[in-house]
Amino acid sequence: MRIGYGYDVHGLVPGRKLVLGGVTIPYDRGLAGHSDADVLLHALADALLGAAALGDIGHYFPPGDPRYKDADSMLLLREVYRHVQTAGYRLANADATITAQEPRLAPYIDAMRERIAAALGVTKEQISVKATTTEGLGFTGRGEGISAQAVVLLLDREAGAGL
């Protein structure tokens, strides 16, 4: 068993789509970044890599590399999980929290869980996504950006289905 933690943050800017957990969310701004800047998937990717001691997302997808300009982070997450599986692990479960003052994310959480589960080839019950605010405090509270944190539990791939 191995545990990993990931964190990501991006600023909100006009003229970009807001993509979280692979779901496009209607909003007047989106997240700044080289790829689609999906903070939830980036935090999840870092948690997966960390649990397997495989480095971080920037090692695999350097922010200045033109191949990843506006890249779909769901594809990056799938690639990360292939590395994790090659290292001999499989996902037991993931738990993630998005911190954003706006927009309201509750209506999109189920779709995020479904997209992430499908990308990783696991059940929706293995993926938890929550959203919270900072009650107006800090950069997320002022609406300057969105952050996400994720924790994963990996099991040896050869281990039985139960924990």
Curated annotation (Swiss-Prot):
Family annotation (Pfam families): YgbB (PF02542)
Alphabetical list of SUPFAM superfamilies matching this protein: IpsF-like
UniProt EC number: 4.6.1.12
Cofactors required: a divalent metal cation
Known catalytic reactions: 4-CDP-2-C-methyl-D-erythritol 2-phosphate = 2-C-methyl-D-erythritol 2,4-cyclic diphosphate + CMP
Pathway linked to the protein: Isoprenoid biosynthesis; isopentenyl diphosphate biosynthesis via DXP pathway; isopentenyl diphosphate from 1-deoxy-D-xylulose 5-phosphate: step 4/6
Residues flagged as site, Transition state stabilizer: 34, 133
Alphabetical GO biological process terms: isopentenyl diphosphate biosynthetic process, methylerythritol 4-phosphate pathway; terpenoid biosynthetic process
Cofactor annotation remark: Binds 1 divalent metal cation per subunit.
Molecular function GO labels: 2-C-methyl-D-erythritol 2,4-cyclodiphosphate synthase activity; metal ion binding
PROSITE patterns xref list: ISPF
Keywords carried by this UniProt record: Isoprene biosynthesis, Lyase, Metal-binding
Residues the entry annotates as binding 4-CDP-2-C-methyl-D-erythritol 2-phosphate: 8-10, 34-35, 56-58, 132-135, 139, 142
Domain of life of the native organism: Bacteria
CDD domains: MECDP_synthase
InterPro entries: MECDP_synthase, MECDP_synthase_CS, MECDP_synthase_sf
Residues that bind a divalent metal cation: 8, 10, 42
Family: Belongs to the IspF family.
Assembly and interaction partners: Homotrimer.
Function summary: Involved in the biosynthesis of isopentenyl diphosphate (IPP) and dimethylallyl diphosphate (DMAPP), two major building blocks of isoprenoid compounds. Catalyzes the conversion of 4-diphosphocytidyl-2-C-methyl-D-erythritol 2-phosphate (CDP-ME2P) to 2-C-methyl-D-erythritol 2,4-cyclodiphosphate (ME-CPP) with a corresponding release of cytidine 5-monophosphate (CMP).
Name used for this protein in its record: 2-C-methyl-D-erythritol 2,4-cyclodiphosphate synthase
Source organism: Moorella thermoacetica (strain ATCC 39073 / JCM 9320)
Encoding gene per record: ispF
